[in-house]
Amino acid sequence: MQISYIGMQTQEVVIKPILKVLLKSDSQNLEEVVVTAMGIKRSEKSLGYAVSSVKGDEITKARESNVLNSLSGKIAGLQIAQSSGTVGGSSSIQIRGASSIGTVSSPLFIIDGLPIDNGSYNPDRTNGIVDVGNRAGDINSDDIESINVLKGAAATALYGARAKDGAIVITTKKGKKNSPVFVTVNSSTRFENVLKLPDFQNEYAQGSYGVYNVKMLNGWGPKISSVQDQQFTDYKGDKVTLKANPDNVKDFYETGMSYINNVSVAGGGEKADFRLSFTSTNQTGVVPGSDYNKYAFSVNAGMNFTSNFTGRISAQYIRSDSEGRPAQGANDSNLLIPLINGLPRTIDIHDIKQNWMDENGKQVTLDPEGKSNNPYWIINKNKFTNNLDRMIGNIMLTYKPIEGLTITNNAGTDFYTEGRRKVYAKGTVGALNGKFQTWNLYKRIINNDLMATYEKTFANDYHFKVMVGHNIYQEEWKNENVQAQNLVVDELYTYTNAKSTTPVNYSEKKRLVGVYGDISLAYKDMLFVNVTGRNDWSSTLPINNRSYFYPSISGSFIFTELMKNKDILNYGKIRLSYANVGSDEDPYNLAFKYTPASTYFLQYLGSVNTFPHMGLVGFTGPRVLPNENLKPQNQSSFEVGADLRFFGGKIRLDMTYYSNITKNQIVSIDVPLSTGYFANNINAGKIANKGVEVTLGLTPVETRNFKWDLDATFASNKQTVEELAEGLDEYTLTSGLSGLQVKAAKGDSFGLYGTAWKRDDQGNYVINSKTGLRETVNNVRLGDVYPDFTMGINNTFTYKGVTFSFLIDIRQGGSLYSETIANLRSSGLAAETLAHREDASFIEPGVILQADGTYKPNDVPVKSMQDYWQHTANSSNNEGNIYNASFVKLREVQLSYSFPRKWFKSFFVKSLDLGFEARNLWIIKDHVPHIDPEANFFGPSQIGGGVEFNSIPSTRSFGFNLRLTL
């Protein structure tokens, strides 16, 4: 007798009075459906391009407050960079490398067919940046059914200009028709601590050249053990004996807590289904006084009004708030990390925690002269706050007037308002009179897609499907910013309490209208061809150039359908695609744009003043010369790949090669100041991204009770800047980082440029004959921004009801500049600065250039190791702070037990799972001292990478999870 079931392997058994049969999953016979562009559902075998999918269960294995972090290491070609260890912090995402010079290369996010915002607005690029997260972090992971990553232009062409850098298509969970009501509870409690702390020396006090100086926050003073019989003045003015406090930095950080709780109710009747969900995320950070709270309510409901007319609504409301998120970067009075890492080894962290303010309410600074803020003054007095309200929702109506014809309209909106406030209490070093700044942000996206689809099968062998559609997309952005200075009453942060206020308001609007079409042909379920085309009209481009068309063609061939013997190779597909897409630019770059000014400079008086002036507000003209002849950016994409399945699916191999060429970049080039402008927008530049992606799945062992699955991903992308503007060999993407610049240089990938050590032909350091220190040379390429390759290896072991899995995340290549390490070394606090301190004749290995042009071995000792490190690790000597950013990490661990359902037969409980979960647990190998090599100063809205600038240290988390279905 044969026993079969959909999606399971058929088994033949001998007939007995009592049979117990366990059917195994049959991944070969189960038709996998993938959600692609415009929400079109296609069979996986029909796709002529690479699509990677992650199920919702994979995302919630070890939940993160930002869902993007859960994708790290799981998808080939997808690179995630977490910006900091701040609670609710942001993460940038990139697919197949950076393709643009003038704009951020970030994929489009889609939820249930609606494009949503993933911005991360930050008014400053380097000064006092507070990481407030990116908008994709608002998405609740418990509501996600699946995430499909569309990588190539052929996969995303129907979305138009917005998806030139790929698309992340999210499908949310729904109820089921004719299903009883289920209540599901998912609760996690996590503990969080700093992943990696600096290695400090604990032998020397603060000072200079071995002499104690309480005014200095460093480690260049006397050896502590040699002055035990002496007393010195501390930061409070008390006489003390010097003593090392090895854990003063470690003890500053707290154990963060994270509570993520979700309750959902789902079910359905004969004509309707529904799912309601509520999630609360409550976090306290490792930085004292920092917290993040997010509350998300979602609904997804569908209704069959008639046999041929249906409707579905999907909506999410998110409310989040935070307090005490610390500032990062430079040049800001509220910076914490330089203060904490810069603590002299003699300072007791518990002492300054108890003595940050005197009885008169005045700050007790870290030095008697009041030049360094007490970190606990910043934590208690200068709290950054923000709150956000966001609504994402769409309504989809579907009508089927005749057999084979489907008409769908999907209308939706994504809008949010956010308020931020940064404060500096009176008495703060750098802002003694007190000040504050507020932002009121508003973003709204409106999108409507009307589509008509017709499909028909001919002669049983041919299947034809055609779709035409129309899209209207509009987004609005507003920013109301007020700077208030010189407070009358301390800690009263109202505009009327400030002697000077400077309002700066800005708004912009953009509209895109498009028409598109899609034709699919299939023959005998083994040969598939898909052709798409889209034409967009953009409001941000000149009238003559605002219309642009981009086509795509893709195909797949299931060659194993022609094979008789499939014992070894069960399934084989070859796929091929080509696409050409265009994109526009930001609004208001075609004409003269005047923006509000907050300050003005009186040349002859040499003073800076603020607006309003004598009751009049000020405006300034554009810095960039408008260009009315701009054309759309253009990208051509070619992709070829194969999907193979061996031995009944026990070996699964997907391979892809791609080549993306992006030209007509819209960039700003410098122009003579005599023109009255700083730059001019032009079409120029050509960037190539070529690479390979491999996904390998193995099931090495599978028995009745035990199964081992191994899934590995590999991706390598080579970026090359093939062309820039005429006469231009390099273009600065980002600067203002202690002389370091991120540049696009002709013939290279995006790289780090700055001051390097001068070398002879053999690579030896050239040493200054007077100081014994290395000589420097400017504007040298110091390293690549992006890695050579990335890998992820995920192992899952299942034994009866026990599941154990762990994910290894690998990055090879790329460089990292660290300002944190520069500060640690130049201040004499890093452990490695102990070497040769007592050696008065340390000679740096290298050569000295002689008068006749020849070199001789260096024989000049440095004056002291203080001079050596303050030169070698000086932030302006960039090469001294560049490191190999490669790493191997234990990214994720999960252990869970599913209690047998038979235990609950007489109860209302349908299922119960208990588990242990951990994220970012261990840096197995890296080449960067003191900090996490994954540290990234650039957020999702910035171009560049490979830079760490006084960032909040990253964290590891571990805890417990309970899942219950009633």
Where are these regions (language model features)?
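Short, small/polar-rich motifs associated with maturation and membrane association
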Residues: 1-298, 304-306, 310-312, 316-318, ...
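Glycine-rich, aromatic-lined ligand/substrate-binding cores of catalytic
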Residues: 784-819
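Conserved small-residue
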Residues: 184-239, 589-590, 603, 682, ...
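Extracellular/periplasmic, surface-exposed regions of secreted and cell-surface proteins
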Residues: 59, 106, 221, 259, ...
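Acidic/polar loop-and-plug regions of large Gram-negative outer-membrane beta-barrel proteins
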Residues: 239-240, 318, 323-390, 443, ...
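Short aromatic-centered micro-motifs
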Residues: 3, 109, 521, 759, ...
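Extracytoplasmic gating/loop element in the C-terminal half of outer-membrane beta-barrel translocons
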Residues: 234-238, 249, 538, 813-913, ...
